[in-house]
Each structure stands twice: as C-alpha cells, then as structure tokens.
C-alpha cells in the first residue's frame, strides 16, 4: 500500500471547488497512478473523515513551445471526494 501523503499531492482551490465545499465535496490533485480506493483510504487516514464517493478525472499534457524547443507539460489527475453526511468538514484554510 502506498503512503497516503504520496497519493494526495495538493488541494485544488478554484471558484468551482470552493462552491463544492458547501456540499462536502473536496477536490485534490492526486498521483497519476492512484486509483479510487487509494484516494479514499488516503483521505480517510489523513483527515480522519468517512468518504462516500470518489470521482477521478485525467488531464493529458499540453504541447508547449518556447522558440525552437518544444515539449509537453506533465499530465495530471484530479479527484473529487464526497464525504458522508455525518462526517466533519475538512479544514483546508487553517489559520
């Protein structure tokens, strides 16, 4: 089993993800090779909450060129995690 801190890279903070937080849905950028079960276990271990559902999206790398040099940006994987009704909220913006 992978270390939970290797599965979750960082939270994704956008206007849409902030709106989803009111519905107990949290967005994270995760490891490209992580599956839904690993994401669920990692969130439950790190934050101490119960996860109801996990949705995962893949983003392919974009083609970029700087002068005569061309290449690709890294591919990414994003997970939206929905918590159960009785679980506490995750404090992403801790003071």
Swiss-Prot record:
| GO MF annotations, alphabetized | rRNA binding; structural constituent of ribosome
A GO CC term attached to the entry:
ribosome
- Assembly mode: Part of the 50S ribosomal subunit. Contacts protein L29, and trigger factor when it is bound to the ribosome.
Q: Which family does it belong to?
A: Belongs to the universal ribosomal protein uL23 family.
What's the protein name? Large ribosomal subunit protein uL23
HAMAP family, per this entry?
A: Ribosomal_uL23_B (MF_01369_B)
Q: Which InterPro entries match?
A: Nucleotide-bd_a/b_plait_sf (IPR012677), Ribosomal_uL23-like (IPR013025), Ribosomal_uL23/eL15/eS24_sf (IPR012678), Ribosomal_uL23_CS (IPR001014)
Show the PROSITE patterns listed in the entry.
RIBOSOMAL_L23 (PS00050)
Q: Which gene encodes it?
A: rplW
| GO BP term, example | translation
**Keywords carried by this UniProt record:** Ribonucleoprotein, Ribosomal protein, RNA-binding, rRNA-binding
The task this protein performs is described as:
One of the early assembly proteins it binds 23S rRNA. One of the proteins that surrounds the polypeptide exit tunnel on the outside of the ribosome. Forms the main docking site for trigger factor binding to the ribosome.
